[in-house]
Amino acid sequence: MFIDKAKVFIKSGKGGDGAISFRREKYVPLGGPNGGDGGDGGDIILQVDTGITTLLDFKYKKKFIAEDGENGGASKCYGRAGQDLIIKVPMGTIIREEESNKVIVDLSKKGQEFVLVRGGRGGKGNTKFATATRQAPHYAEPGMPGEELSIVLELKLLADVGLLGFPNVGKSTLLSMTTKATPKIANYHFTTLKPNLGVVAIDGIEPFVMADIPGIIEGAAEGVGLGIQFLKHIERTRLLVHIVDISGIEGREPFEDFVKINEELKKYSVKLWDRPQIVVANKSDLLYDDEVFEEFERKVKELGFAKVYKMSAATRDGVDEVIKEAARMLKEIPVKELEISEDEMYIPEEKRFTYVIDIEKDDEYNTYVISGTFVDRLLSAVNIHDADSLRYFHKVLKNKGIMNELREMGIEDGDVVRLNDFEFEYLL
């Protein structure tokens, strides 16, 4: 089964909590703090694996969570860092942020790695909070939470040449004749339902990758059939081989087919429409009158194309000429990275974890309510039953400007300040 799009949820590991611990040994009455730091959470890393050709694995697994860091321990023991989670993807995978649909990274190189989300930092143990005036801190820092992200993986095949044309014009036959690929071939429409890749390796030319794209029909750019899914797979090709059934045995007019396909390309992407094309009139062995080819060639040249190649993939007549021309043109066409504008790029916030502080006044009870991620993190680090810890708590509120903001809001002596389930009276 060929899967070229998948949605998954990823989360890096949480940092381990710092430890609150004190040295307790015989004959050491004032051992002091010795709580160790927590370990960092595991990252999630994307890695290109050339042995994978589809996103099938992501059909069955939708959630990826890295390992949390271990908590710190006594005797200044540091927690073990969480193990990184490596997710292997096919070459040519584009990663998008689901909500905005913006591109995070284009994984188009062999062995390429990208750290998608970083693990939370481990919290500091109480050893790190000891000072000359605060020698026995009864608090430690909790680990930072892991980062969460919902992403879309989108596979776009990496091929030098894309075979383009209506269904049943001979694209798969040409691929099978010139590579070791074994696409399904039959005399009916949409025999090919997934892209096929093959390496063209013929004496005298430099090898290149050719892709057989499932047949495109009128309205493909608007999604008729599986049009958009098929069209996106030729976005990365440097050269298009546009194959037309010149025999007309199915009742279609060859030149009309040629024009319709190019119109679909233009609707989907002007850049794709402007890509170099080799025009091939296939099934020439079934042609009853050479004037049909000559008329087709004349009309195509009027559109600005230099040459039309007459070919019969079934008898291999003219195949080598087409392949050699493709190899020659590829030497002149530079390899380009996928162009992504700034507007299309997903730029994460500089601070992956931001402190949110929200202060509201409840006039009925003269209570000031402080909430947000900052409060959750601060309270998890403070021992409210320890005087030294409460002094640290007050210092943090002051340094963060919260006490000044409370005064600006009109707080008075005796008013209540609430942080989650913890309350205290404000004293001037």
From Swiss-Prot:
* Source organism phylogeny: Bacteria, Bacillati, Bacillota, Clostridia, Eubacteriales
| OBG-type G domain span | 159-331
**What are the entry keywords?**
Cytoplasm, GTP-binding, Hydrolase, Magnesium, Metal-binding, Nucleotide-binding
Which species expresses this protein natively? Clostridium botulinum (strain Eklund 17B / Type B)
Q: Which GO terms describe its biological process?
A: ribosome biogenesis
Q: Which positions does UniProt annotate for GTP binding?
A: 165-172, 190-194, 212-215, 282-285, 312-314
Kindly indicate where the leader peptide sits in this chain: none
- Could you tell me what this protein is called? GTPase Obg
State how it assembles.
Answer: Monomer.
The EC category is hydrolase
Record flagged with keyword Nucleotide-binding:
yes
Protein localization? Cytoplasm
One Pfam family hit: GTP1_OBG
Q: Name one GO cellular component term.
A: cytoplasm
Kindly list the cysteine pairs connected by disulfide bridges. none
Q: What are the binding positions for Mg(2+) in this chain? A: 172, 192
Q: What is its EC number?
A: 3.6.5.-
